[in-house]
């Protein structure tokens, strides 16, 4: 059975704009989409991206797509292609939007849908690698508005700048999934 998911990089992109670092958002997007299909038991087959920009900055586009390519390689899925749309009158200078689409496969008998949960089943908990692709609007409000930090300030307790920490690539659960199933 084919399983598909589509998602966007969300407001994590605001941090990429503020820091000038664009590689991790593509990688995170792939991990996010792959994690979305893993919950149904599917393994990724292929990925497509959609990058919409105001003005085309080749260096930024290459950095974003390089991150997508690394994410696809690490998740054993082919990057089939995608779309890069230039819309000069739609996006502010230096800003863009990024979305991705993943298709995976799972044997019908192995689809995870909750229907086979029984008393006595083992529940597996996994460590989180931190914020994933969701929650960045709240995180930015806390870090910038409440704590009064900038992207270059050290995030207390991390030894890293706010930008480095919040743009860290979040994990894909595919390696753990492969060991379990």
Predicted feature locations:
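Helix-biased detector of long, well-ordered alpha-helical tracts
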Residues: 1-181
């Amino acid at each position: 059975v084919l399983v598909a998911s589509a998602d966007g990089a969300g407001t994590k992109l605001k941090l990429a704009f503020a820091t000038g670092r664009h590689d991790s958002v593509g990688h995170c997007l792939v991990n996010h989409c792959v994690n979305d299909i893993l919950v149904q038991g599917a393994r990724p087959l292929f990925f497509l991206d959609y990058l919409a920009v105001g003005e085309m900055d080749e260096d930024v586009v290459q950095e974003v797509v390089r991150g997508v390519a690394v994410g696809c390689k690490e998740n054993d899925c082919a990057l089939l292609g995608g779309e890069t749309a230039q819309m000069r009158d739609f996006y502010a200078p230096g800003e863009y939007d990024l979305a991705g689409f993943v298709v995976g496969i799972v044997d019908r008998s192995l689809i995870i849908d909750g229907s086979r949960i029984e008393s006595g089943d083992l529940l597996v908990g996994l460590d989180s690698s931190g914020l994933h692709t969701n929650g960045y609007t709240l995180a930015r409000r806390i870090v910038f508005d409440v704590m009064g930090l900038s992207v270059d300030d050290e995030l207390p307790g991390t030894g890293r700048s706010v930008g480095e920490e919040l743009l860290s690539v979040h994990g894909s659960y595919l390696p753990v999934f492969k060991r379990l199933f």
